[in-house]
Amino acid sequence: MPEVQTDHPETAELSKPQLRMVDLNLLTVFDAVMQEQNITRAAHVLGMSQPAVSNAVARLKVMFNDELFVRYGRGIQPTARAFQLFGSVRQALQLVQNELPGSGFEPASSERVFHLCVCSPLDSILTSQIYNHIEQIAPNIHVMFKSSLNQNTEHQLRYQETEFVISYEDFHRPEFTSVPLFKDEMVLVASKNHPTIKGPLLKHDVYNEQHAAVSLDRFASFSQPWYDTVDKQASIAYQGMAMMSVLSVVSQTHLVAIAPRWLAEEFAESLELQVLPLPLKQNSRTCYLSWHEAAGRDKGHQWMEEQLVSICKR
């Protein structure tokens, strides 16, 4: 019987890509180009010449057998493969960086930029608190804020285009961490000039009133939990883009709205609003701080996490 030839384990092992044959410096170039999505800016960040970065990108394309970056307007756009690689590469670089001597994060001198999403209506109270606190203890750090979730938020967290989200929504996927910060009491708001509402309502009366709400078409709308059936949605007479417009409309009409107590009380006097108990089972919402697990090993990220928890805990 003829003898079957098989590869020796040593031969199979040698056929695999060898890490020692890879120039790991290329990964720092990949990380910078992914973050900047512009060769010139990446070169500036790295302290390299533009031709040197372009050459490194060409070698990266060979290493990963993919284009990685394609021209887009005045910059470049990562391919699907580049996005797939980014989280793992960045996490690996952060692990190495954190172990280097003298690699501790120094907030007083750092010029790092953090991108936060503080969702409405929380932005109206937390943004100024966060901004002022960070400016006082780390004046060279820049914090960039936006105030709404969208369909791309998970993608932005995964690739650290947004580093933290503060919202009433938590992220259920195992790759995300969501830490509860506080629980907000919800109230029913009506104009002091409302012709029939002069005190607390009973549960069965709430949806007999006409309501103003944050638009249910908005991704992760603040108002969505209270209008989860067709019958409840039928009570809505006005849908606005933000809670402030909702409260303004309520103050000038016979509509009612559901809002956080702190927000309703802040504007109760100026808008002449009644702030009443909300006689529904869901009369509170938990606020969460969320981030992607890959970012949590970064010392600067850990510092900002501690600051946000300290500022926002009630």
From Swiss-Prot:
Induction of the gene: Gene expression is repressed by H-NS, activated by itself. More highly expressed in minimal than rich medium, poorly expressed in exoponential growth, levels increase in stationary phase (at protein level).
The species this protein belongs to is: Escherichia coli (strain K12)
Q: What happens when the gene is disrupted?
A: Has no effect on leucine biosynthesis nor on bgl operon silencing.
Q: Which domain of life is it from?
A: Bacteria
Example GO biological process: regulation of DNA-templated transcription
What this protein is reported to do is described as: A global transcription factor. Activates transcription of the 9 following operons; yjjQ-bglJ, yjjP, acrEF, ybdO, yjcRQP, casABCDE12, rhsD-ybbC, fepE and gltF, in most cases it probably interferes with silencing by H-NS and activates transcription. Represses transcription of the 3 following operons; uxaCA, sdaCB and btsT. H-NS repression of the bgl operon, leading to the ability to metabolize some beta-glucosides. It also directly activates the bgl operon. Activation is H-NS and BglJ-RcsB independent.
Domain HTH lysR-type, first and last residues per copy: 22-79
Protein name, per record: HTH-type transcriptional regulator LeuO
What's in the GO CC field?
A: protein-DNA complex
Which InterPro entries does the entry mention? Answer: LysR-type_TF (IPR050389), LysR_subst-bd (IPR005119), Tscrpt_reg_HTH_LysR (IPR000847), WH-like_DNA-bd_sf (IPR036388), WH_DNA-bd_sf (IPR036390)
Q: Which family is annotated?
A: Belongs to the LysR transcriptional regulatory family.
Gene Ontology MF, one: DNA-binding transcription factor activity
Task: Quote the DNA-binding region ranges, renumbered to this chain.
Answer: 39-58
Keywords of this protein's UniProt record, alphabetized? Activator, DNA-binding, Repressor, Transcription, Transcription regulation
Tell me which NCBIfam families the record gives: PRK09508.1
